[in-house]
């Protein structure tokens, strides 16, 4: 009897988690895949028609292109700036205060940040009173105001700047913790051997930070693929700024097309899988 009870004990502990996983993750995922093969009202089977829309429609091709733009500039920007601030702030006297200032945008909701930056980018025709901070500065120095959110491709980069402003502090905090974990003996030994700061950074700092960098990069990549809040609040995907997640939202709630929205969700999920696989593989190597 005791042996049987011992065999059931792991199931008792794991069972609720497995049931929760099946109900709230596996079932919705499978249902989404099923709905992606149905029409807008989930009444008739349409085969791969929704996936054809995802990969051939002009609006989705624009969304893929913009997500790729975010993938490159946002990821490189946040990780590079985060690493730079992590190293520089570690050397200043008021480290905690400096970190708090840089990290502060993360404390603001992404919707709130989008609203603030939308006002900063606000455009009025030349000759009108400018209420946007950036255009007011341009006018003061004798330049014409720019439609930061209206003109492509500058509007995509203007949106990416908002993402950098929000997420750089997050990257800095994670990389700063890893940077402080680098043994000082390694750095001192390298300096004794005649290594300059660039060589120390290349041969000691980067290799020691590689696990943290991998985690931060994969986190930023996932954030890029599902970027939504900033786009929705500031442009709603108009003027050539559409992205995958925002298009999925529109298809589902604005156009009531469940089939297309589900197909976009499935494609987005498949795009995230390789990133998560690389992250898990890195963790297993470290273990």
Where are these regions (language model features)?
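A structural signal for multi-pass alpha-helical bundles of membrane permease subunits
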Residues: 2-287
């Amino acid at each position: 009897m005791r042996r049987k009870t011992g065999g059931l004990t792991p199931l008792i502990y794991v069972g609720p988690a497995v049931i929760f996983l099946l109900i709230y993750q596996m079932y919705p995922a499978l249902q989404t895949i099923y709905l992606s093969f149905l029409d807008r009202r989930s009444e008739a089977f349409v085969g791969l028609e929704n996936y054809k829309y995802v990969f051939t429609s002009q609006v989705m091709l624009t969304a893929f292109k913009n997500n790729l733009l975010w993938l490159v500039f946002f990821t490189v920007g946040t990780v590079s700036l985060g690493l730079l601030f992590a190293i520089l702030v570690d050397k200043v006297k008021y480290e905690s205060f400096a970190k708090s200032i840089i990290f502060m945008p993360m404390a603001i909701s992404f919707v709130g940040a989008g609203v603030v930056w939308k006002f900063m980018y606000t455009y009025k025709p030349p000759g009108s009173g400018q209420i946007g901070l950036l255009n007011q500065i341009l006018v003061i120095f004798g330049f014409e105001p720019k439609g930061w959110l209206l003109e492509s491709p500058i509007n995509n980069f203007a949106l990416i700047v908002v993402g950098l402003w929000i997420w750089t502090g997050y990257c800095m905090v994670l990389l700063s913790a890893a940077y402080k974990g680098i043994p000082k003996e390694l750095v001192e030994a390298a300096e004794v051997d005649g290594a300059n700061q660039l060589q120390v950074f290349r041969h000691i700092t980067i290799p020691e930070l590689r696990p943290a960098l991998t985690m931060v990069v994969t986190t930023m990549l996932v954030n890029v693929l599902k970027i939504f809040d900033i786009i929705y609040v500031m442009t709603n995907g108009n003027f050539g700024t559409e992205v995958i997640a925002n298009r999925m939202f529109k298809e589902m709630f604005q156009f009531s097309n469940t089939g297309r929205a589900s197909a976009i969700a499935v494609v987005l999920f498949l795009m995230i899988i390789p990133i998560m696989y690389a992250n898990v593989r890195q963790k297993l190597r470290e273990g």
